[in-house]
Every structure is written in structure tokens, then in C-alpha cells.
From Swiss-Prot:
PSII is composed of 1 copy each of membrane proteins PsbA, PsbB, PsbC, PsbD, PsbE, PsbF, PsbH, PsbI, PsbJ, PsbK, PsbL, PsbM, PsbT, PsbX, PsbY, PsbZ, Psb30/Ycf12, peripheral proteins PsbO, CyanoQ (PsbQ), PsbU, PsbV and a large number of cofactors. It forms dimeric complexes. This protein is only loosely associated with PSII, and is not often found in crystals. It comes from Thermostichus vulcanus (Synechococcus vulcanus). This is Photosystem II reaction center protein Y. The lineage of its organism: Bacteria, Bacillati, Cyanobacteriota, Cyanophyceae, Thermostichales. Loosely associated component of the core of photosystem II (PSII). PSII is a light-driven water plastoquinone oxidoreductase, using light energy to abstract electrons from H(2)O, generating a proton gradient subsequently used for ATP formation. It holds the Pfam family PsbY. InterPro entries: PSII_PsbY. Belongs to the PsbY family.
């Protein structure tokens, strides 16, 4: 159903944007722990 894609696309874009912003911080935290 194309409506599922219409709903999922912005959700995936937002998730990808959030991951891209959070990832460097998360990596820094992990390196601090190790």
C-alpha cells in the first residue's frame, strides 16, 4: 500500500537525521567507557 510508504518515508528521514546527529556523541561516550 503506497500510503504506508508515504507515512514511513518522513519517519525514516527523521530517524536517519537523528542517528546522524547522535552517532558522534554516542561514539565519544563509548570511547570514554573503554
Amino acid at each position: 500500500d503506497w500510503r504506508v510508504l508515504v507515512v514511513l518515508l518522513p519517519v525514516l528521514l527523521a530517524a536517519g537525521w537523528a542517528v546522524r546527529n547522535i552517532l558522534p556523541y554516542a561514539v565519544k561516550q563509548v570511547q570514554k567507557l573503554l
